């Protein structure tokens, strides 16, 4: 990518942005993981959880959400100023599941946010350790990406539900910083910008006054983040147009939707990181593993090795399939919701099925669900091979894709052809070629039409045996091309409801 030199690696975003060498980055990421692990151990002690209960992913999610809520300053301020009945703005909590007399019981716990902040800081050598918090946000975002299809959100902003492969990170909170921005898909950025422009259309004071100046700089910053994700000059030029607009309105929304559609073929660079639940880091730390000393990377073999040696359990509803629940969580752990299923099956060593074929609902359990016949089972999170995560979209080409999802956003840097339904994508590009972005539009359409079916992405890159820690012998997988490549294929996944 042309501007690569000006970008920071994600490890630098996760650390303090100073240029560091690989060893320092690994130590620094390891330190963040240590902090999450130590916090988790302490919370399990506070909550008197057994080892098994501490490895239950539902308990992990509750504990993670408690600390994220304790540090959500804007929301905490809002709650102080707008008190609502029955909600204590100073407290946070959630469901904790315990095994009592051979069955699972739900217990609602409540803690002072101040107390949670104290435990978190203590686990992180007195720091706020924002990077650890962001890491947990990205894990939650990856889990949402794997569990839900954002059809409604796409339709509301005037986009097409088939563009779901562009929606990585669509549920990340605004406060997720540079590391969060790096993992957001093209569609997510476009959706945030469209929402902003629509507010400006409906509220004439949105761009005005002191607040309006802040709004404007946020708008331009988001445009620049999106521009940085595009890999062709024409797409970037289009983003310059949108950013420089005096009074953003429907023309800009049109341009944004056009650029999002074009990203189905001319894919943007979106970072992928394997962020694991806190209940994986906790037991590793308590067994004496020193992440800071050993070093850790979110984009290499480390998360695969950690999952090979971890026991994680999950509650299972009466009619759910534990193997399907495992697939859902495995995909979330590797940020792979929009990756080609053929490649995922190869890496995992077991068949990875489309979302609509899975007999499983989300991992979290609603407060009104009956606990009487809840079982629990081990999540199978191991893999046959490992591969390096990518932050590029790979180059383009086409192949039959599906009714639901018509393109992929690669997670792993592994040689393959990238499926997308060219005729479907191109059909959306009839009509509007006039206006000030007409030359860019023409150029983008020309590039899309030139995308060749036989082109291979990530040429020469392969997967590696788990014993090959230094990535010396790439194994280039071969695929059955007749197989379905999209996860959200003509799909019936639940909607994400905030």
Swiss-Prot record:
Lineage: Viruses, Riboviria, Orthornavirae, Negarnaviricota, Polyploviricotina
Pfam families listed in its UniProt record: Flu_NP (PF00506)
GO biological process, one term: viral penetration into host nucleus
Residue ranges annotated as motif Unconventional nuclear localization signal: 1-18
Chain positions of motif Bipartite nuclear localization signal: 198-216
Region (Disordered): 1-21
Family: Belongs to the influenza viruses nucleoprotein family.
GO CC, any one term: helical viral capsid
UniProt subcellular location: Virion; Host nucleus
Comp. bias (Basic and acidic residues): 8-21
Keywords: Capsid protein, Helical capsid protein, Host nucleus, Host-virus interaction, Ribonucleoprotein, RNA-binding, Viral nucleoprotein, Viral penetration into host nucleus, Virion, Virus entry into host cell
Protein task: Encapsidates the negative strand viral RNA, protecting it from nucleases. The encapsidated genomic RNA is termed the ribonucleoprotein (RNP) and serves as template for transcription and replication. The RNP needs to be localized in the host nucleus to start an infectious cycle, but is too large to diffuse through the nuclear pore complex. NP comprises at least 2 nuclear localization signals that are responsible for the active RNP import into the nucleus through cellular importin alpha/beta pathway.
Protein name: Nucleoprotein
Modification after translation, per record: Late in virus-infected cells, may be cleaved from a 56-kDa protein to a 53-kDa protein by a cellular caspase. This cleavage might be a marker for the onset of apoptosis in infected cells or have a specific function in virus host interaction.
Annotated source species: Influenza A virus (strain A/Memphis/6/1986 H3N2)
């Amino acid at each position: 990518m042309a501007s690569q030199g000006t970008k920071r690696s994600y490890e630098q975003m996760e650390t303090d942005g100073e240029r560091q060498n690989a060893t320092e980055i690994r130590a620094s990421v390891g330190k963040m993981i240590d902090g999450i692990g130590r916090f988790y151990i302490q919370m399990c002690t506070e909550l008197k959880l057994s080892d098994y209960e501490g490895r239950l992913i539902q308990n992990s999610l509750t504990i993670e959400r408690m600390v994220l809520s304790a540090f959500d300053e804007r929301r905490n301020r809002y709650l102080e100023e707008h008190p609502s009945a029955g909600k204590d703005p100073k407290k946070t909590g959630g469901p904790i599941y315990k095994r009592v007399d051979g069955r699972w019981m739900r217990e609602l716990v409540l803690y002072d946010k101040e107390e949670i902040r104290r435990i978190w800081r203590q686990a992180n050598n007195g720091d706020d350790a924002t990077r650890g918090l962001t890491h947990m946000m990205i894990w939650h975002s990856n889990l949402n990406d794997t569990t839900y299809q954002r059809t409604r959100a796409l339709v509301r902003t005037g986009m097409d539900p088939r563009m779901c492969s562009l929606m990585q990170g669509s549920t990340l909170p605004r406060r997720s910083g540079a590391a969060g921005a790096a993992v957001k898909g093209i569609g997510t950025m476009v959706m945030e910008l469209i929402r902003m422009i629509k507010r400006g259309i409906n509220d004439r004071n949105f761009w005005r006054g002191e607040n309006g100046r802040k709004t404007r700089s946020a708008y331009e910053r988001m445009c620049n983040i999106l521009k940085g994700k595009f890999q062709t000059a024409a797409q970037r030029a289009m983003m310059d147009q949108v950013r420089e607009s005096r009074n953003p309105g429907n023309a800009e929304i049109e341009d944004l939707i056009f650029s999002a559609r074009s990203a189905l073929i001319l894919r943007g660079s979106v970072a992928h990181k394997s962020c694991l639940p806190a209940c994986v880091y906790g037991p590793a730390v308590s067994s004496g593993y020193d992440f800071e000393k050993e070093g850790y990377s979110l984009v290499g073999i480390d998360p695969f090795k950690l999952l090979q040696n971890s026991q994680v359990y999950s509650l299972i509803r009466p009619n759910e399939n534990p193997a399907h629940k495992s697939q859902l969580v495995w995909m979330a752990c590797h940020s792979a919701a929009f990756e080609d299923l053929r490649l995922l099956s190869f890496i995992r060593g077991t068949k990875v099925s489309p979302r609509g074929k899975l007999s499983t609902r989300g991992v979290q359990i609603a407060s009104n669900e009956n606990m009487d016949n809840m079982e629990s089972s081990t999540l199978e999170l191991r893999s046959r091979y490992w591969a390096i995560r990518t932050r590029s979209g790979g180059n383009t080409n086409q192949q039959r894709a599906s009714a639901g999802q018509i393109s992929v956003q690669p997670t792993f840097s592994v040689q393959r052809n990238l499926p997308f339904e060219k005729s479907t994508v191109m059909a959306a590009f009839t009509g509007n070629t006039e206006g000030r972005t007409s030359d860019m539009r023409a150029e983008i359409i020309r590039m899309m039409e030139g995308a060749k079916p036989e082109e291979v992405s990530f040429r020469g890159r392969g997967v590696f045996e788990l014993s090959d820690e230094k990535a010396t012998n790439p194994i280039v997988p071969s695929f059955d091309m007749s197989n379905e490549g999209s996860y959200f294929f003509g799909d019936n996944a639940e909607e994400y409801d905030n």
